[in-house]
Design a protein with these regions (language model features):
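Mg2+-dependent phosphoryl-transfer enzymes with acidic/Ser/Thr/Gly-rich catalytic loops
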Residues: 151-238
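Short, hinge-like loop/turn segments at secondary-structure boundaries
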Residues: 23-27, 47-50, 87-92, 159-161, ...
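Short, well-ordered alpha-helix to beta-strand connector turns
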Residues: 9, 27, 113-114, 193, ...
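Metal-dependent catalytic neighborhoods of phosphoester/phosphodiester hydrolases
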Residues: 15-24
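Conserved acidic, metal-coordinating active-site core of Asp-based
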Residues: 59, 63, 67-189
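Short, small/acidic-rich helices and loops at N termini and domain boundaries
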Residues: 29-31
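Glycine/small-residue-rich loop that forms an oxyanion/phosphate-binding "nest" at active or ligand-binding sites
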Residues: 40-58
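Single conserved hydrophobic/aromatic residue that forms the stacking wall/gate
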Residues: 2-13
């Protein structure tokens, strides 16, 4: 009944998520920014909006500037970067989303962003994650969707909280929910949903908490999991 993504509602909403809802004729809620924003696919109705506090975002951006990190700022339906570089080009190639380069203005934004995405070299990833958590303890929640992506959200914001909020809105119990994922930012859903499903190419820690593992995403794992549940072809362990 809903679509959950870590990316934003700008180009992703128009190119990757909304077309499926339109094709099916369903005004389903679209969960984006790791749960920070939930909007109706067709109506645009806002169910959840939990951006980072502006001062927290500005402090994070100053940290990014001082440490020479690459950052992406998700604000409204736009994605902003300081300048185009290998990271922005890589992200555009993977996601199909073209960022808007705004130079030094990125460090002095005037609007609270939905999410910040910090990219590092893989070998610096763990150390950077730890440093951000220590310096901004209690002010930001950190997760990741790839080995060099640090995703920074308002405390308490995650995919499960967004799904849970929607479920309560529709009168659905947690045990009646199935969530499918592959990365660290999916763990909150996998752990708490009645049926947490990991695709075969999911991170080991995601598979560890999943109640079932389906085929990889390249082998229609999501479709197979849904079909199996709907046709009661599997027994979900307690």
């Amino acid at each position: 009944r809903d679509l959950v993504r870590s990316r934003g509602l700008g180009d992703v909403y128009k190119r990757q998520m909304r077309p499926y809802a339109q094709k099916l004729g369903l005004d389903v809620p679209l969960v984006s920014y790791n749960g920070a924003l939930v909007k109706g696919a067709l109506s645009g109705k806002v169910y959840v909006n939990s951006p980072l506090k502006l001062q927290t975002a500005l402090d994070l951006l100053q940290y990014v500037k001082e440490n020479g990190h690459y950052v992406q700022v998700y604000m409204g339906d736009k994605l902003y970067v300081k300048e185009e570089n290998e990271y922005s080009r890589m992200y555009a190639k993977i996601s199909g989303i073209q960022a808007v380069a705004i130079g030094e203005e990125i460090y002095s934004i005037k609007e609270a962003p939905n999410k910040l995405l910090l990219m590092t070299a893989t070998e610096n990833f763990e150390a950077t994650w730890k440093d951000v958590e220590e310096k901004f303890k209690g002010r930001v929640d950190v997760t990741s969707s790839k080995d060099n992506y640090l995703e920074l959200m308002e405390p308490g914001v995650n995919k499960w909280q967004a799904v849970k909020s929607l479920a309560e809105n529709f009168g659905i119990k947690p045990e009646e929910i199935m969530c499918i994922g592959d990365s660290n930012n999916d763990l909150s859903m996998i752990k708490n949903a009645g049926i947490g499903v990991a695709v075969a190419n999911a991170k080991p820690q995601v598979q560890k908490y999943a109640k079932m593992v389906t085929a990889s995403n390249d082998n229609d794992g999501v479709a197979l999991a849904i079909e199996n549940i709907l046709t009661a072809q599997i027994n979900v362990p307690e």
